[in-house]
Amino acid sequence: MEIKEISVPLQGVVADYMNGKKEIQSCFDYLLTEDAFKQRLHDLREREFFRQDLVTHLLEYNTQLQAGEFTIQNIKALEDENTYVVIAGQQAGLLTGPLYTVHKIISILQLAKEKEESLGVRVVPVFWIAGEDHDMDEINHTFVTKNKKIKKTIFHDRYPKKASASESEFSIEDCRKWVEEIFKTYPETNFTKDVLQFVDDALGKSHTYVDFFAHLITKMFANSGLILVDSHHPALRKLEVPFLQQIISKYKEIQVGLRNQQEVLKELGFKPIIETKTNAVHIFMEIDNERVLLEENQGKFIGKDGVHSFSYEELMEEMERSPERFSNNVVTRPLMQEYVFPTLAFIGGPGELAYWSELQQVFHTAGFQMPPVVPRLTITYMERDTATDLYDLDLQEIDPFLNNIDNLRDNWLSNQIEEPIDERFIEAKKEIMDIHTSLQQFVKKIDPGLNEFAGKNELKINEQIELLEKMLKRNVEKKHEVQLNKFRRLQFALRPLGAPQERVWNVCYYLNQFGLDFVDRVMEQSFSWDGKHHVIKL
């Protein structure tokens, strides 16, 4: 493997944040300097955490996942008040979801190691699985290449319900068939059998989306020391009850904090991402096997527009009695993460960084400082065939990341023709239409009754010219088919569906191509935190 860093233009909040603009940096409580991390350590030492109870739960959960010894050691280290975490989170996507999930984990492993060395304290990596999420459409699919097209392949659960990913059981046999269909789209390699077995072993131990995800990640990062936490685990929720009750008691202040911070961002020219009703409580409650967002109405807490109604006292009692029925929304999830873990740093993608910028005053309302927010590493893998296509097309490695590949293709094609087709046909149409307009005027003078026919005649001539243009372009493309296919392959490999590779493709393709130790070899690379994009040549 060879790693190359390239500067890719950033957009929105993350661009201003990484470019050091003070206005947006003021929406966060810490800069990304070594002094700021030292200040964060000082601030965390002023707080208390339920470390022993947390360690007991994490040991039980990760042991069930058959986590490696290094992970167990890291969990036990959390008993020590001088141990901190670098944390990131994601939904439990099938087959681990898009590549960026793996890249988030690589990011927390790298940053935890670096900060442990530079700060002289124990720093352990934690990955927060968003098990409370109930939007199955975001996690029930992956993308593959089939018949020279990119296809979204969905796992259709035969018993769908609006439950959380931690509670949504699926048919192992149905999922196994879905996995086999995915792998049929991959080339057969020396690694295919082992990777299929690797996936099937994880699937065989699973009952839910979160189970499958957690077993795969545990096996994939077996020797890394990674700690997993399911945010919707009943045992964890039990530990969270005091803070859940605090959220309910402070929901108005939380909402005001959110609105005020969003106004700050609007004044800076940014459109807020988080959309909530003014009476939102920011807590979900499971009612009749569905996850329902609570709202306040005339002193009552209601769900489904008043179909369900609870008093404040009833909610408090139910939280004590059945804490597993409650979960956080997008606003309170970061707060709960801050309550549970002594967080040295949170790692997020561009979208997360943008929405966290809306939460500063929400954190303050809860009595917290927002942890340092570090943009995750961004990575693209470039296979040898892709590099060869770039060379054959006389393109630089950076070109597909700075330019639309369709535009690169069109520019290349136009350079193969002496005179631009589009321009020549535009001129021809104008010349012919000018002649025809004059002709129509002549016809109208002699026989006005033919005026409508003359207009139709003009349309037919125009259609024939457009048909000729279309056929010419098709023949030109056919003549250069070999080279144009290289542009298509570049698009599929580096910018599938016009998006970054890591937002579309799944890690299993690369495990199948390069072996089960692929992720381990990626983690051996040296990455920088300067916001540059990392291209790894395979």
From Swiss-Prot:
The keyword Ligase applies. The keyword Ligase applies. It is an enzyme of class 6 (ligase). GO terms for molecular function: ligase activity. Residues 460-483 form a coiled coil. Keywords: Coiled coil, Ligase. Its EC number is 6.-.-.-. HAMAP family: BshC. Belongs to the BshC family. Involved in bacillithiol (BSH) biosynthesis. May catalyze the last step of the pathway, the addition of cysteine to glucosamine malate (GlcN-Mal) to generate BSH. This is Putative cysteine ligase BshC.
